[in-house]
Amino acid sequence: MDQYDVAIIGSGPGGYVAAIRCAQLGMKTAIIEKYSTLGGTCLNVGCIPSKAMLDSSHHYEDATKHFEEHGIEIPGEIKVNLEKMIARKQSVVDQTTKGIEFLMDKNKITVYEGIGSFKDATHINIKKNDGKTEEIEAKNIIIATGSKPSTLPFITLDKERVITSTEALKLKEIPKHMIVIGGGVIGLELGQVYKRLGAEVTVVEYMDRIIPGMDAALSKELTKVMKKQKVKFALSHKVKSVERKGDQVIIKADDKKGQEVVFEGDYCLVAVGRKPYTDGLNADAAGVKFDERGKVIVDEHLKTSADNIYAIGDVIKGAMLAHKAEEEGTLVAEILAGQKPHIDYNLIPGVVYTWPEVAAVGKTEEELKEAGVEYKAGQFPMRALGRARASMDIDGFVKILADKKTDEVLGVHMIGARCADLIAEAVTAMEFRASAEDISRMSHAHPTYAEAVKEAALAATDNRALHV
């Protein structure tokens, strides 16, 4: 029987990063993955392929709507080749997953393909695709099995017309009318992809606003921008049935007045979040306990109820984000090596990769009000930037929330071009407990989108933004 210092079940961003860090720290490491490719949801059917589709569809939209204004004239009709677009997406996925294989080899990590299940707290059975079972032993084990799309109890996912994000990334045709159930990150990103390609898109959301977990100002601005892009929204609608009839899908929902509303389309994307994936893990055999939501219970060091077993990523509490899982994977590896790492969960940024992009870190205005914290806010519009006007990306703003007395930055919320990258500046500043004045006095290159961060900091510092 092969023996290891650490075995990791699941090869998503949390699992493979944990494996690499463990190996770097001198531990004999194994990783177990049930699929034939490494990388988990993120690399195979999540973050990476959805960004590939977002970029491809963005190019198409620019070519059909914006090139002429830039003085670029393309003779003839511009067409979408969806098959080729999806093939390119798959090539990006293939390159990325092969890159993870390379990293496993480079770091001398043993990879097992199959379903890993606990025999006890130190032994894992690996059921391979050919039906054979192999057993390994590990001093420490990390559960990194991730999540899968959630649904509603009354919805039957046929994966043809009533689909999840996985199927939405490999459709054979552009929908005529895609109805998206859920106004969160996944629904909005994939809804925007197919809207750009020519589909009619209607987003049906139970809450009274989209991206409800983010600052209300971001929700309001993104709604306004996406309505301008002709995406339709049915907010405060409670879906009660989804029925397929041939090539049509009929969705019935009650609006906020309790009146029934019927939506008809040829595809329904169910994007109501994700849930922990622990099927077949047999965690009870190792003494691992779960909460009422099916998440693995861990302490502040991410240790489970079993002394040598840890859990990271989507299977435990907190935001279901790839970069959160990566930080947790690194943290556990370093704890096992006797180090004292830390994660500030308040400083894990959240991003929506629509265009304009939406990004945030720290506290929202709603959270500060609820906690009774006295704060000041500074906001700066993207349209006031020369760089934004040059690129025609004028939607959005940057908002900085700072403590009224100390000026420490408590939250940064932004929507606009390249905000997914800009948010890193805010994370860095907040990690070092910067004040709004600190950011306002840093030189930002001109002309850039990042100048909006400086200007918002100026606005939060005695309301002295320069360019509005």
Model-derived regions: residue spans:
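N-terminal Rossmann-fold NAD(P) dinucleotide-binding loop
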Residues: 15, 187-188
